[in-house]
A protein has these predicted regions:
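Extended ligand-binding clefts on enzyme/binding-domain cores
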Residues: 89, 125-129, 133-136, 142, ...
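Low-complexity, Ser/Thr/Pro/Gly-enriched N-terminal "stalk/linker" regions
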Residues: 2-90
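C-terminal capping/lid segments that line or modulate ligand- or cofactor-binding pockets
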Residues: 147-152, 157-160, 323-343, 381-463
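Aromatic-rich carbohydrate-recognition surfaces in CAZymes
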Residues: 85-113, 117-220, 436-450
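Hydrophobic alpha-helical transmembrane segments of multi-pass integral membrane proteins
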Residues: 40-45, 51-55, 220-225, 301, ...
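Extended, well-ordered alpha-helical scaffold segments
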Residues: 53, 107-123, 180-200, 269, ...
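Long, acidic, intrinsically disordered low-complexity segments
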Residues: 19-53, 114, 195-217, 341, ...
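Well-ordered alpha-helical scaffold segments within catalytic/enzyme domains
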Residues: 33-46, 94-107, 166-181, 260-279, ...
């Protein structure tokens, strides 16, 4: 289960920090703007270990996971997760999103990100119910025997609502940074129409829709009950998600964090469609669905907890059943403000945040030094660095932010990188040594903290 480096993971254990980043000649993509940021961070941050980690983690997506080409004269970028040679709509969006701020200094980086947008558009049009794809339609997938409509070029066909939201977030972020509408052509508009269709199908007002999924597996997290469509829901306006961002099956199909994400993404898509394509009918439909989902969340997703008061449930069925928990994968309840789902001063979110970071969340784990959220995917006592990163990115005060960074600094187990998960009492027991999303997200956190004059001093106070 564990990838074990066998190296202690405290700052005191290192007399120096070895070179673990790929040599320049072996890097998949080179960005002068990112190299400049790394040099600036290392020069001005006194904490040598954090400088080393930033230099390794922030460029990891570019160094190791992106494959740029041009198809029919248009940028086309395939982005693998790291140790899995497949492109997840979710991961690929999150992996390159932190680079948006650097496009103005690096036009090649901008073209790379246009390529990601174009590739995601083509994948959504291929199958909006799939979560992960190959660049080669002839490549064999181990999931070919899944009982669902597998097509050539699909790695896995788990329907996850957030997989349709992340490409919108990336597209919107790109558009806002550049005011460039060139990637948002007729094909992109068709992809947005497809997203809208799937969201409406998965409101399940007129039956279960066309998607179902069953897998022959010993893992319960892959099991979708009721003939592969999931447990019954009351069609109250929310959107079903058969799987979570962790690729684990939902218990109750209305996955609350993903619905909040959809509220933000549908609103963003509406704005883009209205201003770029001038299709007011489609823009109005997108906005109307966003409002419908938001209102349903406020009506059905809020529960009264005996200790924390009003909080958002993790999953619900619309009949009154609710699952109170949180998972480390994003979108989760912890990350709602980060993704634009709620305002950071939302009172119910504040209560929810305290709940998910407590022993009342069955997947919150606390060791002698480390604490954080894990999930069903890896199991008991395994903390995901992503949860610590997201707690820091939504931090309420300096002490909380600094504590998260200090814990993250001590999780790398000598590898110089973040991992998928680590044991609450022993970071040397970790999963996935090459997980680019966590690396880039950690880099985003450090760069954001470093560049904010309100928090800049905290970087140099970390030990």
């Amino acid at each position: 289960m564990f990838a074990n480096s066998g190296v202690a993971s405290t700052a005191a254990s290192f007399s120096s920090f070895p070179t673990v980043r790929k040599p320049i000649s072996e890097r998949n993509f080179k960005s002068p703007a990112i190299e400049k940021a790394i040099a600036t961070f290392k020069q001005k941050v006194k904490n040598e270990e954090l400088g080393w980690l930033f230099g390794n983690c922030f460029p990891n997506t570019l160094d190791t996971t992106v494959f740029y080409s041009e198809k029919d004269g248009r940028p086309d970028t395939y982005v693998i997760t790291g140790d899995i040679d497949a492109m997840w709509l979710r991961d690929s969006s999150a992996q390159v999103y932190p680079y948006l701020d650097f496009m103005s200094e690096d036009k090649n980086l901008q073209r790379l990100i246009i390529g990601v947008i174009n590739k995601q558009t083509s994948f959504i049009l291929k199958d909006p119910y799939a979560n992960a794809f190959y660049d080669d339609d002839t490549k064999y997938t181990r999931w070919n025997s899944d009982h669902t409509e597998m097509k050539p070029g699909i790695h896995e066909r788990k329907y996850e609502l957030d997989s349709l939201c992340y490409p919108i977030r990336l597209a919107y972020g790109y558009w806002k940074k550049t005011n460039d509408a060139s990637p948002f052509d007729a094909q992109w508009k068709k992809a947005i129409e497809t997203v809208l269709r799937v969201c409406k199908e998965q409101q399940r007002k007129d039956g279960n829709g066309p998607y179902s999924f069953r897998r022959t597996s010993e893992w319960a997290i892959d099991a979708v009950p009721m003939g592969g469509v999931g447990y019954k829901v009351n069609p109250v306006g929310l959107i079903c998600s058969t799987f979570r961002p962790s690729d684990d099956a939902t218990i109750f199909p209305f996955l609350v964090p993903s619905n909040f994400f959809a509220v933000a993404s549908l609103r963003q898509a509406s704005e883009m469609v209205q201003k770029i394509t001038k299709d007011n009918v489609l823009a109005d439909e997108l906005l109307a669905l966003s409002k419908e989902v938001y209102n349903a969340l406020q009506t059905y997703a809020v529960v009264n907890h005996p200790k924390f008061g009003k909080i958002y449930a993790f999953e619900i069925d619309g009949f009154g059943s609710a699952y109170l928990s949180d998972d480390a994968n994003v979108p989760n309840l912890l990350a709602l403000p980060y993704l634009g789902g709620v305002d950071s001063d939302d009172a119910i979110y504040a209560n929810t945040r305290r709940f998910v970071w407590s022993e009342y969340n069955p997947y919150f784990f606390k060791g002698s030094y480390f604490e954080g959220i894990g999930g069903h995917h890896i199991g008991t006592d395994m903390i995901w660095p992503m949860s610590l990163i997201m707690k820091a990115l939504t931090a309420q005060d300096d002490e909380e932010l600094q504590r998260c960074i200090q814990m993250l600094q001590k999780t790398h187990a000598g590898t110089g990188f973040m991992h998928e998960s680590f044991h609450k009492d022993d970071p040397k027991k970790f999963t996935r040594s090459w997980f680019a999303w966590a690396n880039t997200l950690f880099g985003e956190l450090l760069w954001k903290t470093f560049n904010d004059w309100n928090t800049n001093h905290l970087i140099n106070q970390c030990k």
